Amino acid sequence: MTPVHFSFTSAFILGLMGLAFYRTHLLSALLCLEGMMLSLFIALALWALQFESTGFSTAPMLLLAFSACEASAGPGLLVATARTHGTDRLQNLNLLQC
């Protein structure tokens, strides 16, 4: 494994561990998801450059579009839950009670 692959793999694993262990606030969960998506985008872009094919070049742009949608919907959900529940702590949020 090259150092480049190791750095992107470790960035994804750190984001996943942050999502699993530090789930106290919704904002920290959204930031961990954003870090995971960024490491996936860079890894997918490098993978597309390695194969030098035009068929693989659309995958990073599609992932970037989905991560932009996630990044724009996240703060809206954060504001909505803070207004309705009074907090953004994930322990107090229950989707069955909404």
UniProtKB/Swiss-Prot annotation:
Membrane topology listed for this record: Multi-pass membrane protein
Disulfide bonding pattern of the chain: none
Gene3D superfamilies per the UniProt record, alphabetical: 1.10.287.3510
One Gene Ontology MF term: NADH dehydrogenase (ubiquinone) activity
The enzyme's E.C. designation: 7.1.1.2
Catalysis performed (reactions): a ubiquinone + NADH + 5 H(+)(in) = a ubiquinol + NAD(+) + 4 H(+)(out)
One Gene Ontology biological process: ATP synthesis coupled electron transport
Record flagged with keyword NAD: yes
Keyword annotations from UniProtKB, A to Z: Electron transport, Membrane, Mitochondrion, NAD, Respiratory chain, Translocase, Transmembrane, Transmembrane helix, Transport, Ubiquinone
One Pfam family it belongs to: Oxidored_q2
UniProt superkingdom: Eukaryota
Transport as UniProt keyword: yes
Compartment(s) where it occurs, according to its Swiss-Prot or TrEMBL record: Mitochondrion membrane
One annotated Gene Ontology cellular component of this protein: mitochondrial membrane
Main location: mitochondrion
Protein family per UniProt: Belongs to the complex I subunit 4L family.
Role of this protein: Core subunit of the mitochondrial membrane respiratory chain NADH dehydrogenase (Complex I) which catalyzes electron transfer from NADH through the respiratory chain, using ubiquinone as an electron acceptor. Part of the enzyme membrane arm which is embedded in the lipid bilayer and involved in proton translocation.
Protein name, as recorded: NADH-ubiquinone oxidoreductase chain 4L
Gene this protein is translated from: MT-ND4L
